Curated annotation (Swiss-Prot):
It catalyses: 5-(2-hydroxyethyl)-4-methylthiazole + ATP = 4-methyl-5-(2-phosphooxyethyl)-thiazole + ADP + H(+). Belongs to the Thz kinase family. Gene3D superfamilies: 3.40.1190.20. Keywords: ATP-binding, Kinase, Magnesium, Metal-binding, Nucleotide-binding, Thiamine biosynthesis, Transferase. ATP binds at K112, S160. The gene is thiM. This is Hydroxyethylthiazole kinase. Pathway: Cofactor biosynthesis; thiamine diphosphate biosynthesis; 4-methyl-5-(2-phosphoethyl)-thiazole from 5-(2-hydroxyethyl)-4-methylthiazole: step 1/1. It comes from the Bacteria. GO terms for molecular function: ATP binding; hydroxyethylthiazole kinase activity; magnesium ion binding.
Length: 265
């Protein structure tokens, strides 16, 4: 049977107020339609309409937490792919408890985080206290625990870092695309969360979703590399940011195939 790729999927986002505009823009640039809704009566309709759901816990507030839980449960019930971006889950008990609750009751399709955030979710100790993780080394022991975690919960885990690691417990991949400058732009991790939600929503076939997720991670890194290459003398981080969004809007499969640095395990 021929597999058709969904065009312009609708993505429902419940996200933080720091990067909300950037998430909307990258969603459009990558071929999706963003819609932000948090009112309880409205989101019960919006989530059911959507092709994908993103919940980002960057700025937690009581009403938003309730909205996130309602939408996650709807997505679970309707079979809509969902992503939990576990921003700063290592920082407070509130975040840890909420993330664990939404994973248990909402059963997201994918969990994204940096190494410190993912280590916290799998029960390992992390020394990081902010959005940036300085724990760049992913040990084999931790990698195996992440694989077990993903397999037990039937989800994909994306660990962002110098080398990104993606696994569903059965398949795993490492992605070496990207540039250090991406870590200096507020929200590049959140923007990746939007791309991952789109990646899941492009296909209804679960078998295709893992490779599409890996492609999204690699694509984002390649856009960073291209954005850096475009910089001229005396152009700094803000020019880099706009170059990054620019590259996402014009990148194509030929460029991705030429530049991707992906190792499947």
């Amino acid at each position: 049977m021929e597999v058709l790729k969904r065009e312009n999927p609708l993505i429902h986002m419940i996200t933080n107020y720091v990067t909300v505009n950037d998430l909307a823009q990258v969603t459009i640039n990558y071929g999706g339609l963003p819609l932000m809704a948090t009112h309880h009566d409205e989101l019960k309709v919006i989530t059911k309409m959507a092709n994908g759901l993103l919940v980002n816990i960057g700025t937690l507030e009581p009403y938003q937490m309730e909205s996130s839980m309602i939408s996650m449960k709807i997505a679970k019930e309707k079979g809509i792919p969902s992503v939990l971006d576990s921003v700063c889950v290592q920082v407070s008990k509130l975040r840890r408890d909420f993330a664990k609750k939404i994973i248990l009751e909402g059963e997201p399709s994918l969990i994204k985080g940096n190494l410190a955030e993912i280590k916290t979710l799998i029960g390992e100790t992390s020394n990081s206290i902010g959005i940036d993780s300085f724990e760049d080394s992913l040990s084999e022991n931790t990698k195996n625990k992440i694989k077990e975690y993903a397999k037990e919960r039937n989800l994909i885990v994306v660990v962002s870092g110098v080398v990104d690691f993606i696994t569903n417990g059965e398949e795993s991949a490492s992605v070496k695309n990207g540039t250090y400058k991406m870590s200096k732009i507020t929200g590049t991790g959140c923007m990746l969360g939007a791309l991952l939600t789109l990646a899941l929503s492009f296909y209804d076939h679960k078998d295709l979703r893992f490779k599409e997720v890996v492609k999204a991670v690699s694509t984002w890194g390649i856009c960073g590399e291209l954005a850096e290459e475009r910089l001229r003398e005396k152009e700094g981080l803000m020019t880099f940011k706009y170059n990054l969004l620019d590259e996402l809007s014009i990148i194509n499969d030929e460029i991705i195939k030429e530049r991707e640095k992906v190792i499947y395990e």
